[in-house]
Amino acid sequence: MKTAWVFPGQGSQAVGMGVDLLSTAIAKEKYQQAEEILGWSVVEKCQGDEASLALTQNTQPCLYVIEAILADLLRDKGFQPDYVAGHSLGEYSALYAAGVFDFATGLQLVKQRSEVMASASGGMMAALMKFDQTQLQQALTDNTEVVLANDNSPEQVVISGTVAGVEAILANVKARRAVPLKVSGAFHSSFMAQPSQSFAQTLTACHFNDATVPVLSNVDPSPTQNGDRLKEKLIQQMTGSVRWRETMVNLGEIGATDYWEVGPGKVLTGLCKRTCPDLNLKNIGQLDDLNSL
């Protein structure tokens, strides 16, 4: 049996997440450390207003902290992953779980990343469900203002680009459902190149250890442990596509049998059910999930 720990990204947050973890010493210590770095309380933010929690500059640090705590609690119970991966923001949690950087370094990176993404303006993102694949591929070929931002599953993708470009694709591609996303910019596209420049410099200057277990990155989901290579992939992430469908397929091909979503919600296990039905799925999002292991 080989287990992959996968960490969700923005969109998995929910009011009340992570509060039950406070009964553990590991969580208390991490929440205190996070407050010193962020200047605000993750626990209070997670117990507050839904609209405030949904702001990129709040969501991303909160998710990273909670996912890091859950990974620590799993290890404290004697569990170890054979592989790790994370969806967009979740890649930072995966790198922490693989020992590429420590908790504080990861949170400082996530804080800056969230501020860069929150301040991005212009552009649009939209999710398409049960869409005509041939139509979409042709539309993306014809429309240079839009890219495939998240290839989540055979039935779900996210596109990103100019407002006019995204709206044109939504109007011309048949889909069971198409939902514009409530985000400030065209994330995971070349439109993030300018705002992400300073953050890329921060990442370049940051030391990355070699990973203790193979990491499957968003922009290139081949198993990698070399710290410098993992850094290169992370630098490309904000402007590159999240190749999540390939990540799930690759996990199965390299021998993963169990797929644990470490973080709030069930977004990633939901995607995996449709793409790789043979994998054993488990959600580790709260204390009850840990206690049931």
From Swiss-Prot:
The active site is at 88, 188. This is Malonyl CoA-acyl carrier protein transacylase. Pathway: Lipid metabolism; fatty acid biosynthesis. GO terms for cellular component: cytosol. Belongs to the FabD family. SUPFAM superfamilies: FabD/lysophospholipase-like, Probable ACP-binding domain of malonyl-CoA ACP transacylase. Keywords: Acyltransferase, Fatty acid biosynthesis, Fatty acid metabolism, Lipid biosynthesis, Lipid metabolism, Transferase. It comes from Synechocystis sp. (strain ATCC 27184 / PCC 6803 / Kazusa). It is an enzyme of class 2 (transferase). It comes from the Bacteria. Its EC number is 2.3.1.39. SMART domains: PKS_AT. The gene is fabD. One of its GO terms (biological process) is fatty acid biosynthetic process. InterPro entries: Ac_transferase_dom_sf, Acyl_transferase_dom, Acyl_Trfase/lysoPLipase, Mal-CoA-ACP_Trans/PKS_FabD, Malonyl_CoA-ACP_transAc, Malonyl_CoA-ACP_transAc_FabD, Malonyl_transacylase_ACP-bd. One of its GO terms (molecular function) is [acyl-carrier-protein] S-malonyltransferase activity. It catalyses: holo-[ACP] + malonyl-CoA = malonyl-[ACP] + CoA.
